[in-house]
Amino acid sequence: MLTRRIIPCLDVTGGRVVKGVQFLELRDAGDPVEIAEAYDLQGADELTFLDITASSDGRDTMVDVVRHTAERVFMPLTVGGGIRVVEDIRRMLNAGADKVSINTAAVSRPEFVNEAAERFGSQCTVVAIDARQVPGEQRWEVYTHGGRKPTGIDAVEWAVRMESYGAGEILLTSMDRDGTKDGYDLALTRAVVDAVSIPVIASGGVGNLEHLYDGFTTAGASACLAASIFHFRQHTVQEAKQYLQGRGVPIRMV
């Protein structure tokens, strides 16, 4: 059985790591390079950087953050936020990223995902889906522009389409659960896991270690992404891995 991955997520704006609730109310959590080094030492399997402002002036800041991080850590880095054209991908990969995460640009121009996969490989091409449950229904709608813009697109159908366009992985965030510490949206995650054959990363809502376990077991995620519980030192990545290993989840120990 493939080992499951634990991925801390760093939301970056203005060169600082922040954490919010349902994409709002941001708190400063520190320097991204220092935090990345700490997670590397704790045995994180990967790290995800999301540039949550992603303005053109912020792009150079993010390239610097990625470059400085890649010089000092050994785990794979995924970078997302404002990836709009092939040149954005090239810059991030040249700075030391291993994968890029495409969100808004995929909705605006789905063939961009195909171009990215053909140029750089599916293994580099992650499609991020921010989804919110449709009130009173067992379906989820895709949102873009950092969760600000509803699209009318069904999240499960979108994941299937993105796989067909060459995405190698889906980063699936429940906007309803983001920062709430109430646990992943297991129904959303399971629906996408069952619909695609590529790995799905569960994101949004981890408040304790059992939530990670549920993400791997009940929802079937290949990887679990978390921020608050790690940033604010509720748990270390190592503690999370020891807990999961103790409950029978195949995990890479360091």
From Swiss-Prot:
The active site is at D11, D130. The keyword Lyase applies. CDD domains: HisF (cd04731). Its EC number is 4.3.2.10. InterPro entries: Aldolase_TIM, His_biosynth, HisF, IGPS_HisA/HisF, RibuloseP-bd_barrel. Keywords: Amino-acid biosynthesis, Cytoplasm, Histidine biosynthesis, Lyase. This is Imidazole glycerol phosphate synthase subunit HisF. It comes from Trichlorobacter lovleyi (strain ATCC BAA-1151 / DSM 17278 / SZ). The lineage of its organism: Bacteria, Pseudomonadati, Thermodesulfobacteriota, Desulfuromonadia, Geobacterales.
